[in-house]
Structures are given as C-alpha cells and as structure tokens.
C-alpha cells in the first residue's frame, strides 16, 4: 500500500523524518507530532468522506472489516509497517485516525547520552544491568519513547551470544542478535499469554515483551523469576513505583491474589521516561531491592545524573 494513496499531505508527513505521528481529529483537522516541537496542527482540513475512505482502504489492504458494527480498526500499514488506528461513527462524531511511524534507526545508549536524554552514569548502569542479566521494565506515558529505549537495550543484548525471544502484538522492536525469534499475537487466534507460555519451550535465554498490557503479566513474571533472567518489557505507568502497581493491576485480571514478592523478585530495574519529542528524558531509574510490610523497596540515590560511575563495577557497588 503506497503512502500516496492517503493523499499528498499525509504522504509528505510520513516522509518527513522529524514526524513521528500523524493524527486526524473528527473536526477534520490534521495534526502531526514532531520530534523537535511536539504536536502541532498542519493547517490541512480533511473531509469526513476522505477520512473514511482512508480507513476503509487500510482495512481492505489488511483484509479486515470496519463499519458501524465494528467501528475500530487497528492495523499495520502494509510494506512500510506504520501502526494505524482508525475509528468510525458511532464511537466518534466523524472518522478519525492516528498513524504512528516506526523508528528509522536504532538509537543506542550512546545516542541517548549525546542527545541529553540520559546521563553517562545512567547509560553505564543500564549496560551493566543488561550484562548482568537483570530484568528491566521500561515505563512511561504515551509517546514517551518506551519502545525506542527498549530497542536501545536490545542493541546491547545483541552484543551477547544469548538467544532472544521477542513477543509483540504490533511489530515495533528491532533486534540485531544473530539468534532471535520474533513472535506476534493475533486477535482471536493467539494471545500474548499464549506466546509467553510457548516461549518457555523454545529455549530462550532472554524473554522480551513489547508491551505488557494484560494477563500475560503473570506468565512473564513467572518466566523471569524461574530461570529466564535478562528480559525487557515496557508498560504504561506514571513512575517507577507506578510500573509495579501496574503489574499488580494486570495480574489481577487472572488472579485474585497479587504475588507482590514475585513482582519484586522478577522485576529488577525500572526505567521511567517522561516528556515527548526533544523533551524526552530518563526521569528515574529504580533498582527493585525487595518487598516488605512497607511495600516495594526501591533504590534511586545511586543512579542520579550527577553520579560518576566506576568503570569496573556498577554504580553504588564497592569492591
């Protein structure tokens, strides 16, 4: 499916390397989210008829239904791989959609430091955490760069000889490892929880989940906590502590009892991202050290931007 089929304005936005997302609102206003300046209107107005045609065009290319009875379309644009979410009435006043572009390249941790997104000390700690096979959860709000950072961590994993199993419902992660398997959940066919359980029989060294958003949280925690360390996952949350609470909420979808000690044991590090575009920053890196009657025990002090990390051991460790 050619980008030009959506019209010259959208094609131009998708071709712009500074644009990360294109959004059409019910009032017909077309917006873009740029790396440097965030969300801004394009000044372009699109009719409801044209917007609906685009949504139906995408549906046709992915062999999906979309109509008043099934008004939400979630898809990947063929060939180019952008994430597309289209919505029709009656759930909105007029057709609307959002197109999220895939990353053009993998940002490394060195790139993050050069761009001021994280400090050298934070990057040093994360490299050590990957090398020591700690389980890392990347948390943040929408469009804060969780997947981009997960890709940077995957790039560090690629320097090992580990076998990596990557589980997603939308293809976004990129892995350079010579030995890796990508698996994808399909609505109505295979769930993320199914994939996590299947992964255990594929001899993984590390299990990576693009985004934890459902019952798979419990299966992932069990896998991480029982002989498969060194994984990565992303989750929507407003802080490092909030990421652990989010895991609790997801586990409760399938279990009455929340295994908080298991969460504390399985999740070793939480990286919290805040801001958007050029304003993205690693706001918090927390080491999960345990769980007691006071709740989760988190250590932050050693991973502040002002910390100067040793070269032979992780921040905060002494010989």
Provide a role label for each language-model segment:
Residues 1-41:
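N-terminal anchoring/assembly modules that precede and organize ATP-driven motor systems
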Residues 5-12, 58-77, 162, 254-260:
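Active-site phosphate-binding and catalytic loops of NTP-dependent enzymes
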Residues 16, 33, 39-132:
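P-loop NTP-binding catalytic core
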Residues 138-140:
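Hydrophobic anchor at the beta1->P-loop junction of P-loop NTPases
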Residues 146:
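Conserved lysine of the Walker
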Residues 264-319:
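Conserved P-loop NTPase
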């Amino acid at each position: 499916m050619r980008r030009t089929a959506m019209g010259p304005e959208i094609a131009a936005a998708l071709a712009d390397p500074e644009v990360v997302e294109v959004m059409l609102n019910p009032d017909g206003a077309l917006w873009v989210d740029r790396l440097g300046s965030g969300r801004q209107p394009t000044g372009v107005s699109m009719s409801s008829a044209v917007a609906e045609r685009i949504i139906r065009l995408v549906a046709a290319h992915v062999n999906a239904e979309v109509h008043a009875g099934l008004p939400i379309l979630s898809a990947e644009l063929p060939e180019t791989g952008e994430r597309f979410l289209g919505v029709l009435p009656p759930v909105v006043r007029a057709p609307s959609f959002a197109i999220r572009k895939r990353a053009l390249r993998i940002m490394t941790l060195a790139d993050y430091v050069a761009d001021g997104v994280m400090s050298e000390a934070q990057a040093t700690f994360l490299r050590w955490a990957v090398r020591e096979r700690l389980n890392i959860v990347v948390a943040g709000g929408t469009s804060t760069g969780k997947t981009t950072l997960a890709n940077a961590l995957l790039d560090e994993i690629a320097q090992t000889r580990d076998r990596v199993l990557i589980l997603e419902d939308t293809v976004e992660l990129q892995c350079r490892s010579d030995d890796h398997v990508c698996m994808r959940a399909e609505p109505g066919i295979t769930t993320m929880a199914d994939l996590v359980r299947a992964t255990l029989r594929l001899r993984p060294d590390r299990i990576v989940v693009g985004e934890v958003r459902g019952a798979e949280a419990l299966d992932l925690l069990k896998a991480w906590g029982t002989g498969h360390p060194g994984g990565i996952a992303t989750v929507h949350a407003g802080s490092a502590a909030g990421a652990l609470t989010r895991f609790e909420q997801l586990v409760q979808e399938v279990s009455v009892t929340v295994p908080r000690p298991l969460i504390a044991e399985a999740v070793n590090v939480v990286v919290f991202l805040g801001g958007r575009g050029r304003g993205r920053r690693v706001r918090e890196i927390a080491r999960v050290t345990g769980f007691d009657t006071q709740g989760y025990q988190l250590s932050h002090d050693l991973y502040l931007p002002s910390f100067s990390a040793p070269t032979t051991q992780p921040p905060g460790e002494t010989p």
